[in-house]
Amino acid sequence: MFTMKKSLLLFFFLGTISLSLCQEERNADEDDGEMTEEEKRGILDTLKHLAKTAGKGALQSLLNHASCKLSGQC
């Protein structure tokens, strides 16, 4: 009876430690995912800003050229 209690106690103890380690790894993985999302969001915002700036520059140039042609001052 005593050996059975000892083995059950050992089994419970090892299972608890194993579960604790799995939860720590899961939490660590979730933290890495948040950083990756932030990095992706940062890259996408940068690309969007660059495209927006380039689009504004191209549109401004096109409007200047069109107004020059319409007024005949070119």
UniProtKB/Swiss-Prot annotation:
Antimicrobial peptide. Residues 23-40 form a propeptide. Residues 1-22 form the signal peptide. It is found in: Secreted. Keywords: Amphibian defense peptide, Antibiotic, Antimicrobial, Cleavage on pair of basic residues, Disulfide bond, Secreted, Signal. GO terms for biological process: defense response to bacterium. This is Brevinin-2Tb. Belongs to the frog skin active peptide (FSAP) family. Brevinin subfamily. InterPro entries: Antimicrobial_frog_2, Frog_antimicrobial_propeptide. GO terms for cellular component: extracellular region. Disulfide bonds join C68-C74. Expressed by the skin glands. It comes from Rana temporaria. Transmembrane segments: none annotated. It comes from the Eukaryota.
